[in-house]
Amino acid sequence: MQDILPIHFAPLQGYTEAFYRNAHAACFGGIDSYYTPFVRLEKDGFRNKDVREIAPESNQVPHLVPQLIAPSIEKAETILSLFIEKGYKEADINLGCPFPLLAKRHNGSGILPYPDEVKTLLGLTLKYPQISFSVKMRLGWDNPDECLQLAPILNDLPLRHITMHPRLGKQQYKGSVDLNGFDAFLNVCQHPLIYNGDINCPDDVHRIRQQFPALAGVMIGRGL
């Protein structure tokens, strides 16, 4: 067990924008990595707001990782090209977004029931070895076993870490986190694993850390 557990600042769409991240870093600090809300393609182009949000000159935090969401490697590659243009050497791939309008098009957690599509999408990590990739995901869309079926694919990839939110996509943010499902994935995951979900106070961090001492870190959203 690490003496100090790394804390990752979760990307919350519509909330954790650049000014919020900058203010948090200036007033509180203590965060190992900040993540941008996902960048996506809209009508085959970028939203101006997304481009502004990831611009290095807009961000004054110690360590910022841009996140992308896409249903295909072609779209993911287009987004990654923007990150590279801006000088980033890391990228987080969103396989966790639960919002139905995106998920039904196999974005975010909507792609989790389709292992072949996940494998093709994450081929991005092999095509760009100069980029350090991570993945943020859920247990599945319909079934917590979906992540277990994806484990062999994920284990074969050069990922920096995986962040797991132990709910199903169809739950969105309702119901309880499935800690048994998280434990099952932890036991088959060969990458450093970060826990995300329902961490609202230091006691929650302590409880999760005691239950899962092998954790590589925690990602906190609303609790920050």
Predicted segment positions?
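Flavin-dependent oxidoreductase catalytic cores
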Residues: 1-224
